[in-house]
Amino acid sequence: MCIVAQNNYQQAEEYFMQENFSKAKPIFDSYLKQHPGDKKTREYLGDIAAYGKNWDTAISYYKALVQDEETNANYHFKYGGAMGLKAMSISRIRAFTYIGDIKYELERAAKLDTKHIEARWALVEFYIQLPGIFGGSENKANDYANELGKISKVDGYLANGYIAEYTDRPKDAERYYKKAIEVGGSPHTYEKLSSLYEKNNQPKEAIATTSESLKKHKRNQLNYQIGKISAQYNLEPEYGIECLSQYLADYSIKDGVRKDWAYYRLAQIYKNLGKKEIALTWINKALLDQTDFKEAQKEKSLILAL
């Protein structure tokens, strides 16, 4: 029986790693009934609840874990993080009652683990987003961003870029994100810079940045991103069509953006080019599998009006 139970548990962990939580949860629930004090299982169940945005359930698991092991930084981080995410989902008046506990748990996590990156990132976001009257502080956000920089230069640059972007200093944000690319060069660093350019109405720079990332990382999702920018800003249509065609040719569910969105972007580009019939072909394809695709319905009306 022990071997069978162990095999079942390992299977649940595999499901968890695959994010197949509907299969993992019943096995963990069953195991917890037999081993009610097992911290690892309770953490798994808390994580599954958090993934499903069942904040009260997640908070309940993490709070109990913190009480059982007060010196575990990760438990404090998850407890504080779950409360923070719940606070974002409720009214402001109710959310303010969580501020003290969120701050305590995240700062406790950072103090217990001097290299806990996620806790420091959460504190950067906490202090920069919270109004000053309730304890928000750009200086404290900067302090935690600088702590991140000592642990990971890339995270430090990204955090400082995030603060600059949030406080409407796009030139400073651009400088920090470029440094993050220079030091790290991960897809995420390119994505942050490209997103900044999009927000500040710099589509040429956004396409150039995403194109550079595509050449380096060969991620198919970047083909879609280039096509999206091309469609939205009526920019480099041939390149946009090429990238969207490549996206569809290499598509897998892991790419994250459904095919009908690529069809929609192709329709937009052809509409921008004044090619009504081709645009209609693509927009009808977008609506074929998803008839309630509101953006595509609106786009079709614009195409028909050409």
Explain the meaning of each model-derived region.
Residues T41, Y75, A119, G156-L158, ...:
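TPR alpha-solenoid repeat register
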Residues Y15, A49, M83, I90, ...:
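Residue at a conserved register position within TPR or TPR-like alpha-solenoid repeats
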Residues P36, E70, T114, I151-K153, ...:
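Short coil turns that delineate tetratricopeptide repeat
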Residues Y15, K53-Q67, T71-K115, W121-E147, ...:
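Short coil/linker segments at helix-helix boundaries
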